[in-house]
Amino acid sequence: MAVIESVYARQILDSRGNPTVEVYLETEDGAQGKGLVPSGASTGEAEAWERRDGDKSVYGGKGVLNAVKAVNEVIAPKVIGMDAADQRALDDLMIELDGTPNKGKLGANAILGVSLAALYASAESAGLPLYRYIGGTNGHILPVPNMNIMNGGAHADFATDIQEYMISPYGFDTYSEALRAGVEVYHTLKNVLKKEGLNTGLGDEGGFAPKMKSNEDSLKYIMDAISAAGYEPGKQIGICLDVASSEFYNKETGKYRFDGEERDSAYMLDYYENLINEYPIVSIEDPFNEEGWEDWAAITARLGDRLQFVGDDLLVTNPARLQKAIDLGAANSLLVKLNQIGSVTETLDAIELATANGYTSMVSHRSGETPDTTISDLAVAKNTRQIKTGAPARGERVAKYNRLLEIEEELGSTAQYAGYTAFKACKKYLAK
C-alpha cells in the first residue's frame, strides 16, 4: 500500500499569470506526487465548479486561496491514512465530502489537485512511469498532435470567431517525424503571415493571432504554409477546428454571430459542409452551442460518417452528458479535460465509456496551463490516439510534446504512431 502521510496545497500561477492550485502529496514509503491544476478561458456551463476567491482587490478576484484552504483543512485530514493507489476510493471520498453535483462546495480545482498528486505518488511508489502505471502494457500508441497554430475566439480577443485552427500531422510513421512536420509548418506560417503584412503576435496557446477579414482566410494561409513547408495537405497533414460556438451564440435569438452576421443553425451546418468539401478538415469541435443537442445530432447524422465531431462544452468530460450524447447520436468524439470533471477517476470513466460506444477521444490541455505533463501520459496510457496541447511554442505547451518524445524513446520498438487510425470517421481524405 502507498499510504498517504501528508497532503499540502499552495497557490501558484498558470501560463496566463492567473492563480491556480498545486498539491503536494507524500506516502509513508517516501513516494511523492504533485498535482498542478489547469484552467480554461472558454468554459462550458456544465463544467465542474472552479473555486475562485472573488476578492477583486487581489488578483482581480481570481485567487484560489479558498481552494487551497479546502485541501489543507478539509480534504487532507480525511485522506491521510488512505491508500493513494486506490484512486476510485480516494476520489469518491472527496466527491462525497463536497456533496454537490458539480463540486460546488470544495471546488474541482481543490479535488483534482489531490487526485492528480495521489496518482503521481502511486506511480512512483510502484516504480512505474505514469503512462505505464495507468495503462499497463497496452499503453504504447503515440497520439497525433493536433497543434493549434492560429488562435482566435476567447484565446485571442476574437481575432477570428473560430477559436482554434489546428494542423494534424497524421501521415507519418513516427510521432517524432510528425512533430517535426508540425513545427516546420508552424514556422513557415509565420513567414506566410509576415509576407501578407499580418501581425504574428501569439494567443494564449502559442498560435498566431492576426485579425482576419473572415474565418476562412485563416484556412487559406494554413494551406499555403503546409505546402510551402514541403508537405501535402490532406495526405500528410489535415486540419482540425475548434469553433467554440457557444462563445458567439445568442441564447435569446437562438442564432450565432458569425463573420459579422446573425446565422441560424441551418446556415452553420451548410457552412461546415462547404468547408469540409473545400479543405482537408478532419475534425470540428463544438460546431454548435453546448445545449444544442438536436443540432449536434443533425450534423452527426449528416456528416459524421466522414468527419470527427468533438464534444467539448457539450460533454465536459462528464460520463452522464456523454451517455446522453450516445443516446441521441450527438457527436462522435469526446474531448478529455481533467479539470472539466475534476477527478482522475471520472476522467478515466469518460474515456472508457467513449471507447465502448465507438467514440474517439482527444486528450486536451487548457488555455491556462502549467508545466505539468499528465495529459501526455494519459493519451498514451488510454490509447486515445489524439492529443491537443497548443502550438509548438511556449514552455507549458512544448513540455507536453517533449514528454511524448521521451515516452516514444522509452517504448523503443514497441512504440506505434497512431497516424491515420486516429481519425476513423474521415475516409474522404485519409489513406486506408
From Swiss-Prot:
Q: Where in the cell is it found?
A: Cytoplasm; Secreted; Cell surface
A GO BP entry is: glycolytic process
The residues that the entry says bind Mg(2+) are 242, 285, 312
Pfam families registered for this protein in UniProt: Enolase_C, Enolase_N
Keyword field contains Metal-binding: yes
EC code(s) of this entry: 4.2.1.11
Which InterPro entries does UniProt cross-reference here? Answer: Enolase, Enolase-like_C_sf, Enolase-like_N, Enolase_C, Enolase_CS, Enolase_N
Q: Which keywords has UniProt assigned to this entry?
A: Cytoplasm, Glycolysis, Lyase, Magnesium, Metal-binding, Secreted
Catalytic activity, reaction form: (2R)-2-phosphoglycerate = phosphoenolpyruvate + H2O
Q: What are the required cofactors?
A: Mg(2+)
The record's principal subcellular location, in a coarse class, is: cytoplasm
Q: Which residues form the active site?
A: 205 (proton donor), 337 (proton acceptor)
The cofactor note reads: Binds a second Mg(2+) ion via substrate during catalysis.
Gene Ontology molecular function, alphabetical = magnesium ion binding; phosphopyruvate hydratase activity; protease binding
User: Which SUPFAM superfamilies does UniProt cross-reference here?
Assistant: Enolase C-terminal domain-like (SSF51604), Enolase N-terminal domain-like (SSF54826)
Q: Its pathway?
A: Carbohydrate degradation; glycolysis; pyruvate from D-glyceraldehyde 3-phosphate: step 4/5
Q: What does this protein do?
A: Catalyzes the reversible conversion of 2-phosphoglycerate (2-PG) into phosphoenolpyruvate (PEP). It is essential for the degradation of carbohydrates via glycolysis.
Name-wise, this protein is Enolase
Could you tell me which species this protein originates from? Bifidobacterium longum subsp. infantis (strain ATCC 15697 / DSM 20088 / JCM 1222 / NCTC 11817 / S12)
